């Protein structure tokens, strides 16, 4: 089956966190169109079982295929950890996650071989980052810390709030004590807290933003497969966003962090089957 290189990229997440990945694709791959699905009716994924996350991911990928996408980005660390292998085996379309691109950069950047990973309970508990980092460099020691309150704080829009500062300081103290020199922001919500995390961890710690690294990895994948967009097909709304609930709240959040707002269309809630 011939894939149209000017077809859009499918991106999905449990909610608004994946917008950080969409933002980096918009910035770094300006010839690409995007169809985004935020599963806002079922957020968060971090507390759900592997079987449930695989089922949700299958439903969303089928929905994105109906939108004629040419590749899919699983812009959710939890879904990348639990569902990526299953959906790659099942669907005949290029699919990438957000874990491997960030881990590659962390392995290259660390000087003392002590790498921290923060994420949801599910992501950190999966051990997938540690497994991949150890594969890249067996000498690396990985310290994981689940930060379950970060997602609701971001979803509430409390990006620069004393409560968020206090919560972050408590979570990150353990990693400070472990003297990590590289920290993977292992949830797509977390780059929105980058300034808070930077303030606590200090300038000596390299903060790895998997959203940015994933956009670059996507660009390489598209070039390799001859699918890079040429940007010749004009479209009133090259960026289309779908959610399963709370479209107004999603729209307000998207408006606060995304560029090119005049090119974005956000649809009313839809439920993938």
Task: Label every PLM stretch briefly.
Residues 1-267:
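Non-catalytic structural scaffold of enzyme domains
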Residues 268-273:
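Short "domain-exit" segments at the C-terminal end of structured domains
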């Amino acid at each position: 089956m011939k894939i149209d290189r000017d077809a859009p990229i499918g991106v999905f997440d449990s909610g608004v966190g994946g917008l950080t990945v969409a933002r980096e694709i918009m910035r770094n791959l300006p010839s690409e169109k995007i169809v985004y699905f935020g599963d806002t009716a079922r957020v968060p994924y971090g507390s759900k079982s592997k079987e449930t996350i695989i089922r949700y991911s299958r439903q969303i990928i089928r929905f994105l295929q109906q939108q004629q996408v040419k590749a899919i980005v699983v812009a959710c660390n939890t879904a990348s950890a639990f569902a990526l292998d299953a959906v790659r085996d099942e669907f005949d379309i290029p699919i990438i996650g957000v874990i491997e691109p960030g881990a590659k950069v962390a392995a290259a950047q660390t000087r003392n071989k002590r790498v921290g990973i923060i994420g949801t309970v599910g992501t950190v508990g999966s051990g997938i980052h540690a497994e991949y980092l150890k594969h890249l460099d067996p000498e690396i020691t990985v310290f994981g810390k689940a930060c379950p309150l970060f997602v609701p704080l971001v979803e509430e829009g409390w990006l620069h709030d004393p409560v968020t500062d206090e919560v972050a300081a408590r979570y990150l103290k353990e990693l400070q004590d472990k003297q990590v020199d590289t920290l993977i922001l292992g949830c797509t919500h977390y780059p929105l807290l980058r300034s808070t995390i930077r303030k606590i961890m200090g300038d000596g710690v390299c903060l790895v933003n998997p959203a940015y690294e994933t956009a670059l990895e996507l660009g390489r994948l598209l070039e390799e497969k001859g699918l890079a967009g040429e940007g010749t097909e004009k479209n009133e709304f090259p960026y289309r966003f779908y959610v399963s609930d709370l479209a107004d709240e999603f729209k307000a959040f998207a408006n606060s962090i995304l560029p090119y707002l005049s090119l974005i269309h956000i649809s009313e809630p839809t439920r993938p089957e």
